Amino acid sequence: MNRFFKDVRTIERMKRGPLGCYITFYGDQLLAHGYRRKSCRRKLQLAADFIRWLDRKKILANQVLAKHVGDYLQSRKRSGVGIHLGDRAAVIDFLKLLRERKVTMERIPQPPVTPSQELLKEYDLYLQKERALSPATRINYVPFIGRFLVGRFGRGRVDLSRLRAVDVLKFVRRTAGQLKNKRVLLMTTALRSFLRFARYRGDITLDLAACVPPIASWSLSTLPKSLPPAQVEPVLANVRQRSTAVGRRDHAILSLLARLGLRGGEVGNLVLEDIDWENSRIAIRGKGNRVAHLPMPADVGKAITAYLQNGRPRVPGERRLFLRARAPLTGFKGQGSVGSVVKHALERAKIDSPRKGSHQFRHTLASTMLQKGSSLREIGEVLRHRSPDTTAIYAKVDFLSLRSLALPWPGGVP
């Protein structure tokens, strides 16, 4: 407590009461999660005030309930004491610590689970166990099915045997008008998957998956959205000050994207054990939970080393390679966090790109390899494509080769 408060009387006052001894543990926990001293002081003062309120209400330690958090905050509000953003979370975190220490066994009540949500859990487990789909894929599928079920059954009982082809078509028509083409394709894929799952369980006998209409999609109809190769180096060079922890982190992330063509989610999910320093390799967990071991370029290794030695916070038990810069210091959540790093890097480099996400670095690497003479097969191996058809789109950006195939204009050029 001496790290937060200098006045001995303040510390003694905060430790009074049957729960006062847990204030010190709470302070240690806050520091471990990377909260700054000012934030820690505020949270500790709230916890101590919460303890005093419990004492005044004659609520024993083993009688503390989740509802008491709301009652306490309302009491503060009525007494004219301001409630700041984050106060509720601070008191709840202290209450969680009490539960972890077995001081109180009552858990925060969860909202009732609807039949649709119960079925979604079973479907998600099926995707994980039976189909071996990655969390990223499941996160994309499940919300669409949630909308489908709520739209058909509401919050009441779900009877899949009542589903008909018209229900499927109605949902597709209604939802497709609100989405871009790629999302429509994802939605119909998810819907077919769920309807096969329902038939697999015996909930339906009809093959309703066959009723999901096909969506027109020409995989080679557009060009890959990539940065011009000449703009990649300025993006890396204009990373915010590398003398800061955040700057070193962002430079390491951008180096992985630009040099290895990794997907944003793959970068965000890296853990410390994925780096094989002895053999200069890095393990990448891609689609379908497949693990690939890629050689680690020297500049990428140097960027990661700089971040690990002078940037990455030391958080006990946290194995993610890249951590948030603000408390709580946890690992990145999904590819959106990596995409945010890319977006800000492009803005700092003053590059006006139609795409702001991380995937454009992947396209740029492939286009650069093609221009330097690499075959589509070699590019597919680097990008870890399952099918050659996925790599075939990059043939469209090889303008020199395509120019030689163009037929001359009839009658010559005027």
Q: In which residue ranges do the predicted regions lie?
A:
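Conserved catalytic core of the tyrosine transesterase superfamily
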Residues: 1-414
